[in-house]
């Protein structure tokens, strides 16, 4: 599993919007400047997020984008699924993948299934609201 630039940018945009006034629309130009993403590329990502119902877009004066729900209701997993589709580490576990003829006897399949579950659980446990909390440095023990 490699998360694409599109997926990473979508996360950044959603975090950015979650930190704005929930009643106001944030112009594309402002988001692009803060996130250092080209307006053209960002527009494609925003269109996808509007289509998925994650954000609302309003054209014209006073227009822009805003979240459709509160930050607590968005998980990183849901945002990545909207932009990436499957987050599976191997093709046989992707959404709508044909059943592998070796699935019943594959010695590594349980490993990939567990990894898939760990990724889903971890990304599903983090919401946009979590980015509003102070960051605590992580100590790595040797």
Predicted regions and their residues:
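N-terminal helix-turn-helix DNA-binding core of bacterial DNA-binding proteins
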Residues: 3-5, 9-11, 15-37
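Alpha-helical residues within the helix-turn-helix
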Residues: 33, 50-51
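Key DNA-contact positions within bacterial/archaeal DNA-binding proteins
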Residues: 40
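Short, hydrophobic-biased segments on the C-terminal half of alpha helices
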Residues: 46-47
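Beta-hairpin "wing" of winged helix-turn-helix
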Residues: 53-62, 66-67
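Conserved segment of winged-helix/HTH DNA-binding domains
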Residues: 71-96, 108, 114-117
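C-terminal regulatory/oligomerization modules of transcriptional regulators
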Residues: 94-142
């Amino acid at each position: 599993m490699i998360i694409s630039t599109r997926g990473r940018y979508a996360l950044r945009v959603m975090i950015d919007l979650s930190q704005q006034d929930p009643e106001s629309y944030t112009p594309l130009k402002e988001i692009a400047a803060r996130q250092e993403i080209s307006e053209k590329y960002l527009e494609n990502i925003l269109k996808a997020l509007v289509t998925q119902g994650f954000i609302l877009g309003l054209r014209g004066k006073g227009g822009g984008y805003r979240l459709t729900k509160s930050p607590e209701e968005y998980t990183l997993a849901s945002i990545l699924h909207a932009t990436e589709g499957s987050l599976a580490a191997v093709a046989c576990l992707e959404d709508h993948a044909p059943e592998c003829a070796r699935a019943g006897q594959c010695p590594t399949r349980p490993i990939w299934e567990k990894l898939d579950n760990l990724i889903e659980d971890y990304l599903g446990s983090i919401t946009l609201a979590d980015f509003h909390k102070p960051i605590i440095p992580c100590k790595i023990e040797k």
